[in-house]
Amino acid sequence: MLLFLSVPQPRPPGARTRAGAARVARWRRLRLQQLRRLRGLLRVLRGRPGAGSRRRGRMALCGQAAGAASLPSELIVHIFSFLPAPDRLRASASCSHWRECLFYPALWPQLRICLRVSPAEQPRLEFLMRKCGWFVRELRVEFAAENYLSGGGPGDGGGADTGTGGEEVEALQLSARWLEVLRTYLELVLCVLVSIRNNRNLQKFSLFGDISVLQQQGSLSNTYLSKVDPDGKKIKQIQQLFEEILSNSRQLKWLSCGFMLEIVTPTSLSSLSNAVANTMEHLSLLDNNIPGNSTLITAVELERFVNLHSLALDFCDFTAEMARVLTDSNHVPLQRLSLLVHNVSVMHKSLDNMPNDEHWKALSRKSTSFRVYIMAFDIKSEDMLKILKPSIPLERIHFDSYITCVSGAIVDLISRQYDKFLTHFILMNDVIDTSGFPDLSDNRNEDPLVLLAWRCTKLSLLAIHGYTVWAHNLIAIARLRGSDLKVLEVTEESIDFDQGELADQDVDPVHNLIEQVSLGLGQPWHAVMDIESLSVFTEPNRHFYREMQSFSEDI
């Protein structure tokens, strides 16, 4: 379990007025008195009778005899507030009294937890949430399912079985692992929700569930979920707890739920009071597993969220009526919109209700800083042509394909329509056969990626895998954008060379490519050698969710 906590440092109040200056002076005098008392107390503890040598006095501070354990809790918390997180944890190990003061609410305003879906995480999570769940103001939890498809676990046979019988055994073992990870996932989610059900201080609440690995085997809810939770009691309990948290909240400004298995329902947001909904600043509800025409939020429900600065939804749920609601005079201008376009949603939901070009123009008129981030999973070119309206202020776009490849025409369209806005362009193709990547420049006079770099003058990130990138075009991209292109990630297997470059015996083509691209960018560059190290490829859902969070916060 990875844990990130913020350490609040005391700051004086503002001094813009005479009264403010007086408050600052009083605050500084008070802090100085506190520090003097603290130094005096430490000197007394060092110099008390029987303390012995200077070394003994120093060492005794950590022991019961020196009186460190008898310090008032307020003073210990005050000492903790000056320490960075690692030192704070080490200091709490001195005695039980100091450990009791470690979880004082003022010391833990934020909790950011990344959990492996493993039974070993449960006792640690229970301890932490029992200590902090009732008062924490910002809680971000990510559930990371291990890739059980890789197999090879201890005692699983290690691939020794062959033939039909071996395949059946492997399928049974794989099924058992799916059931175990799903059962653990539900328990961990319950642990988090139970601990914060009565927390009225909660201001930011973010949940991410990495269930994409599980869904690779098909319809998760119809197979493994029915075995783990046959009567649906746990799922219903989780949904009720989530709604209870929303109904009990009084200060919630940020609600984000992405790819969490059947936690959010179409009726969940109705649990929020009007007072909380009216002050909500960020809302993201991402779940491509919702069946049929169901949506997690409707245009009528969105009317209550008059203070939204950022919004993240499934593209098929973002309708023309929603765009109209967001442009109403009683709504504050929307600054950031993140949209997930998934082939599963497109197959089950219609694109007929999506905003037209006039709706996008109205949103841009209401806020000149309005920007859009789109993530597209396996979307056909004809559908992308419908989605990419000219007036969308598209700043970031991420293509992730398994079956359907992006065409050169789509890349060319993006470079022409969004040249004033585009900063991030990601092109990922998870193909099994790496011997023949699609070539976007095929039958074209100019390479679409080079044109993208030429037209989009704000481009700062370009990542490509699974598409042929010619070495001379890569050099051209680096020279066109120069040092403004902060990130250029291209996998080694995606790069190809002309026969003329390979035939030149005097020049090493790979070395020349690295040298020329580095010169163009003004910084050292090399191709991505190990695709597994590229998180945008191995964990596209998590990458999109984290980027969506930072995109929404960057206002």
UniProtKB/Swiss-Prot annotation:
Residue ranges annotated for the F-box domain, each copy included: 65-111
CDD domains in UniProt: F-box_FBXO33 (cd22104)
InterPro entries documented for this protein: F-box-like_dom_sf (IPR036047), F-box_dom (IPR001810), LRR_dom_sf (IPR032675)
GO biological process, one term: positive regulation of protein ubiquitination
Pathway in which this enzyme or protein is active: Protein modification; protein ubiquitination
Keyword Protein biosynthesis among UniProt keywords: no
Keywords carried by this UniProt record: Ubl conjugation pathway
Subunit structure: Part of the SCF (SKP1-CUL1-F-box) E3 ubiquitin-protein ligase complex SCF(FBXO33) formed of CUL1, SKP1, RBX1 and FBXO33. Interacts via its N-terminus with YBX1 CSD domain. Directly interacts with SKP1 and CUL1.
Known role: Substrate recognition component of a SCF (SKP1-CUL1-F-box protein) E3 ubiquitin-protein ligase complex which mediates the ubiquitination and subsequent proteasomal degradation of target proteins. Probably recognizes and binds to phosphorylated target proteins. Recognizes YBX1.
PANTHER family documented for this protein: F-BOX ONLY PROTEIN 33 (PTHR20933:SF3)
Protein name as it appears in the record: F-box only protein 33
